[in-house]
Swiss-Prot record:
This is Endonuclease NucS. It is found in: Cytoplasm. It comes from Sulfolobus acidocaldarius (strain ATCC 33909 / DSM 639 / JCM 8929 / NBRC 15157 / NCIMB 11770). Belongs to the NucS endonuclease family. Its EC number is 3.1.-.-. Keywords: Cytoplasm, DNA-binding, Endonuclease, Hydrolase, Nuclease. InterPro entries: Endonuclease_NucS, NucS_C, NucS_N, NucS_N_sf, tRNA_endonuc-like_dom_sf. It comes from the Archaea.
Length: 250
C-alpha cells in the first residue's frame, strides 16, 4: 500500500508525515541540512531526496554519487514540525549525541509506502556456483564426484577438483561472468601442472557464457566448457547448501 502527496503546502505535508507512522517515507524538496554532534556541518538550499525508514534511519541524497549527503542510523528519534515557515524534520540520537535537521522550504512530493522485509539471497558469486556443484555434481556430468575445493598449485588456486566416472582427475575453473581468453589460459596452466605430476587430468571451464575467441582456444587446447546458465536458473544457486562428507579444503 502506498500514498502520494503532490506539491502540498507545508501544513498538508506535516499532517501527511505525522499520519504515516511505521511507513517508508520519501520527500523530494528544496531543503537545507544542518548537523551537529561530533562535528558540525551545513548543506545549503538545494533540491534533494530525503528517505525516512520505519527503524529511524534517515538518508538524504543529492544529484550525484551513491553516498548520501548526510544520514542518521537506525534508532534515531524522528520529529516533524513547522518552524519559521519551514517544514523541519529532526532526527536525533542520544549516544553519541547527534542531531540532523532537514529544513524543507518547498515540498514537491511525499510518498508513504508499506515495505516489508523479504528473504535475501546473494547469488552469482563463484563461491555460490562451486557450492551448488558440490551438492549437485551431475550438473557437470553423470558420475562426477567432487573431492577437493580451493586446491593450491604453483599457478594459483583451483576452484574445485574431482573425479569422473572413469577415475580421471577433473579440474574445474569457475567464472561468474562470461569467460575470456585469460580464463582458458588459467585452466590450461592447471591442467599442465597436474599432467606434469603424473595425473590424467581433464579441464572444464564453468561459466554463464564464453567469448568466441575463448571457445576457439578452449577447443584447440582440448579443454571443455559447461554453460552453468543452461543447467540452472539464478534462483537455483541460492538453495541451501548441504554438507558433503570427505570433501577436502586447504
Amino acid at each position: 500500500m502506498f500514498k502520494v502527496l503532490l506539491e502540498p503546502d507545508l501544513q498538508e505535508a506535516l499532517i501527511f508525515l505525522n499520519e504515516s507512522v511505521n511507513a517508508l517515507l520519501t520527500i523530494y524538496s528544496e531543503c537545507e541540512i544542518l548537523y551537529s554532534g561530533r562535528a558540525k556541518s551545513r548543506a545549503s538550499l538545494s533540491p534533494r531526496l530525503t528517505i525516512i525508514k520505519p527503524d529511524g534511519s534517515v538518508i538524504i541524497h543529492g544529484p550525484t554519487k551513491r553516498e548520501p549527503v548526510n544520514w542518521q542510523p537506525p534508532g534515531s528519534r524522528i520529529e516533524y514540525s513547522i518552524e519559521s515557515g519551514v517544514l523541519t524534520v529532526n532526527a536525533e540520537r542520544k549516544r553519541p549525541k547527534e542531531r540532523l535537521s532537514i529544513l524543507h522550504h518547498r515540498v514537491y512530493y511525499i510518498t508513504s509506502s508499506e515495505v516489508k522485509p523479504g528473504e535475501f539471497f546473494l547469488v552469482g558469486r563463484e563461491k555460490d556456483e562451486v557450492d551448488f556443484i558440490i551438492n549437485n555434481p551431475d550438473v557437470i556430468e553423470g558420475g562426477f564426484k567432487p573431492i577437493h575445493r580451493e586446491y593450491r598449485t604453483p599457478y594459483g588456486t583451483v576452484d574445485l577438483i574431482g573425479k569422473d566416472k572413469e577415475g580421471n582427475l577433473v579440474v574445474l575453473e569457475f567464472k561468474r561472468a562470461k569467460a575470456s581468453l585469460q580464463a582458458v589460459s588459467q585452466l590450461y596452466r592447471y591442467i599442465m601442472y597436474f599432467k606434469e605430476i603424473g595425473e590424467n587430468a581433464r579441464g572444464i571451464l564453468v561459466a554463464p557464457g564464453i567469448s568466441e575467441n575463448a571457445l576457439n582456444l578452449l577447443k584447440r587446447l582440448e579443454l571443455e566448457y559447461v554453460n552453468i546458465s543452461d543447467k540452472l536458473g539464478d534462483s537455483t544457486i541460492s538453495r541451501p547448501i548441504n554438507y558433503v562428507p570427505n570433501l577436502q579444503r586447504d
